[in-house]
């Protein structure tokens, strides 16, 4: 009886292992095909840079202060600081519509 029990156990283990292995192979092949499709559409992606000191941006470049960036206002022709650009546009556009 024990030999028959061991044989049944080994057969069931083999069937179970084959099922699990085929499921894993199926999942891996589907995900590999999906990954290849995504890479062919969008190319490979570049990892973002992580700086624990917050001195660099996500691309690894030194951070710039908003006040050091200036933008050109198309409406009035002035250069405006980046941290004041939204407020300037609101004033500039409402002032221009009153004239």
Curated annotation (Swiss-Prot):
UniProt keyword annotations, A-Z: Activator, Chromatin regulator, Metal-binding, Nucleus, Transcription, Transcription regulation, Zinc, Zinc-finger
Localization (cell): Nucleus
Gene Ontology molecular functions: enzyme activator activity; transcription coactivator activity; zinc ion binding
Start-end of SGF11-type zinc fingers: 71-92
Location (main, coarse): nucleus
Pfam families for the chain: Sgf11, Sgf11_N
One term under GO cellular component: SLIK (SAGA-like) complex
InterPro entries per the UniProt record, alphabetical: SAGA_su_Sgf11, Sgf11_N
UniProt key word NADP: no
Biological process terms in GO annotation: chromatin remodeling; regulation of transcription by RNA polymerase II
Function of the protein: Functions as a component of the transcription regulatory histone acetylation (HAT) complex SAGA. At the promoters, SAGA is required for recruitment of the basal transcription machinery. It influences RNA polymerase II transcriptional activity through different activities such as TBP interaction and promoter selectivity, interaction with transcription activators, and chromatin modification through histone acetylation and deubiquitination. SAGA acetylates nucleosomal histone H3 to some extent (to form H3K9ac, H3K14ac, H3K18ac and H3K23ac).
Subunit structure: Component of the 1.8 MDa SAGA transcription coactivator-HAT complex. SAGA is built of 5 distinct domains with specialized functions. Within the SAGA complex, SUS1, SGF11, SGF73 and UBP8 form an additional subcomplex of SAGA called the DUB module (deubiquitination module). Interacts directly with SGF73, SUS1 and UBP8.
Domain comment (free text): The long N-terminal helix forms part of the 'assembly lobe' of the SAGA deubiquitination module. The C-terminal SGF11-type zinc-finger domain together with the C-terminal catalytic domain of UBP8 forms the 'catalytic lobe' of the SAGA deubiquitination module.
Assigned protein family: Belongs to the SGF11 family.
Name the UniProt record assigns to this protein: SAGA-associated factor 11
Organism: Candida glabrata (strain ATCC 2001 / BCRC 20586 / JCM 3761 / NBRC 0622 / NRRL Y-65 / CBS 138)
Gene this chain is encoded by: SGF11
